[in-house]
Amino acid sequence: MLGAAGAALLTGVPASAQSAAPDPPTSVVLTSGDDITAFYEAFKPNPIWTRAGVNEAAVAQLIAILQRAPFDGFADGPQLAAQVQTAAAQARSGDPAATILAERTLSTAWVRYVQALKQPTRGMIYAYPVLQPQGTSVAQILLTASAAPSLEQHLASVANVNSVYEQLRDTAFAEAQATGNMTPDPRLLANLDRVRSLPAKGRFILVDSGSSMLTLYQDGQQLDSMKVITGTQELPTPLIASVMYYITYNPYWHAPDHLVRKTIAPNVIHLGLSYFKSHGYDVIDEWSENPNVIDPKSIDWKAAAAGTLHLKIRQAPGPLNSMGILKFPFPNTEDIYLHDTPDHAKFALANRNLSNGCVRVEDAKRLGRWLLGHDPVSPGGEAETRVQLSQGTPIYLTYITAQVRDGKLTYLPDIYGWDKAPPQYASSR
């Protein structure tokens, strides 16, 4: 869950007002015994694990979680599980010193596991710090555990992360137990890293470039899905976590520089300005709501094709507009957004990694209906019109090559190569 800061984010609080939210740590905090001792001395909580003798159900749950932890990417889990078993066995004697030692040993193991589990996804662009995994300090982890009505259920809930993560991890672990090969596939760990930032609860949009599918989620359940067209191998759709606050009807399309250079300018040279005008293009002086339009006759199109002249070209709303009738923007540094398209034939293709990074959606009206709560009808007629959503909706663009099909784990082709190394983005698209 996003907590209080996340709730404020979804109600549309400006990004500037979010700056006070603390950034989560970006690397695993190596917890020492001193950290745990300091926690117990500072907060003086009731025992978490040994409140009325050893909490056998919680200890068994913790041991099982730690034994499975290599499949979360935490290789130290089995070693910590053995330490927990030994400490709990000694505490069952009722010896006060053994009980105190067990309490600290179990807390140390749990904190180390949670801190490893709640790392930000490598290579993901977080539009707001609050979208990163939260609650990784010793005090946050242990106070939350101490306050849980059922410690056993709390441990399971934290370890399961979210429904997508849980299904992938548990399927892989069950298959490993069946075969006896307990070494997790690096591809699995890469995929788990890419989905660990998804929320366990609430409403969000998931765009998966691995399968080129968009899924709508509510409290971990899939409500709807549709095909999308995502980035090519050369121009992949980035990993992004953001929040969508509005949609745009009848959007202008701003042509990327490389398409101006490779497509628009050469076509003007060979076909003349009639090509330019028939496609609804304008050369403008700036990216703004009211730019000045520049006469295309004054442009050196050969220089534009050569890349020595950089033009700002937009396409007016209409049937030829590359954005279709709806655009779904959200804050991010890569200028990525979702949008409609007039070309629906490509959705029939099996391989839909065909875009320049942005995401074309199969049914923009259906997505708009889910976001708005009613049929998307522009209040501004055919003019470009922005409509605010009643509440911000989190959106996650990720890349999932591990799939569970008929109860078995399978892998899709790694077209981006991100199963081997996290993404490094180009400075421009």
Residue map of PLM features:
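Well-ordered beta-sheet/strand-loop patches within structured domains
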Residues: 18-30, 108-112, 116, 131, ...
